[in-house]
């Protein structure tokens, strides 16, 4: 059943900037990291990817999804159709999650190409591949909350919420013992053992406590659990009744 809704949602992204972002954002990230520090390229690229570019891309995908629906019919087309609204909401989340995964694959592909273009470039190994998968898993929770914020408060609010949350809150707590209390710190924290870089961008020395892989399982579990909770909670607001209440409040 969900497959039908996912296909329908995916078609809405046809010939849109959202699909182009899957290629554009990873490329911008790679170029930016190369210009910043070509001598420490791999670790720097993944550091910027986890702190800035990945959160911004997820927020943009969510905001653009909302913007497209709002411009098309202000969700009236969906609300007036004989569909299960919670399935539509889950499909929206699923499509953005798949696009996020696709961007990780594209990003990894660009990194593989770089090792053939630049002779001094370090080879891609299993931990680098694991870093991509971990980044995807630990950012899944951002999708339902950014979709909800985009519908509730608008395009800019969703982007600023996720970007500032990662840059400010994520970096602040990622290296602390209480990193697990802050969802934005999860993807940044798991980059420490996988890529060997501190959240502030400094390479970690061998034996540094931050290089311990013990943080990876709880980060993944916490993200998946929070993702499931937020997806279920936010689906309740996806209804014409809630939209009418919002319109009345704005009018008043």
List the predicted regions and their residue ranges:
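Terminal transmembrane helical anchor/hairpin motif
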Residues: 40, 164-247
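Aromatic- and glycine-rich beta-strand/loop motifs that create alpha-glucan
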Residues: 1-23, 240-252
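Hydrophobic alpha-helical transmembrane segments of multi-pass membrane transport/permease proteins
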Residues: 15-38, 48-61, 158-173, 222, ...
């Amino acid at each position: 059943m969900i497959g039908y809704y996912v296909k329908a949602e995916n078609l809405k992204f046809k010939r849109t900037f959202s699909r182009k972002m899957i290629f554009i954002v990873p490329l911008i990230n790679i170029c930016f990291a190369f210009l910043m520090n070509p001598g420490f390229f791999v670790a720097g690229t993944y550091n910027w990817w986890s702190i800035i570019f990945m959160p911004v891309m997820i927020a943009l995908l969510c905001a653009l999804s909302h913007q497209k629906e709002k411009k098309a019919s202000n969700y009236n087309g969906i609300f007036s159709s004989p569909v299960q609204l919670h399935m539509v909401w889950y499909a929206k989340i699923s499509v953005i999650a798949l696009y996020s995964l696709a961007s990780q694959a594209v990003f990894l592909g660009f990194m593989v190409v770089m090792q053939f273009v630049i002779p001094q470039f370090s080879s891609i190994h299993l931990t680098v591949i694991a870093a991509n998968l971990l980044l995807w898993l630990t950012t899944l929770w951002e999708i339902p909350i950014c979709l909800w914020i985009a519908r509730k408060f608008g395009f800019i609010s969703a982007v600023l919420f996720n970007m500032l949350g990662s840059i400010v809150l994520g970096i602040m707590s990622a290296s602390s013992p209480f990193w697990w209390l802050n969802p934005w710190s999860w993807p940044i924290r798991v980059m420490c053992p996988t890529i060997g870089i501190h959240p502030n961008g400094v390479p970690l020395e061998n034996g540094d406590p931050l290089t311990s892989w013990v943080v990876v399982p709880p980060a993944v579990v916490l993200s998946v659990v929070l993702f499931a909770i937020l997806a279920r909670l936010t689906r309740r607001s996806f209804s014409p009744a809630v939209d009418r209440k919002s319109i009345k409040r704005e009018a008043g």
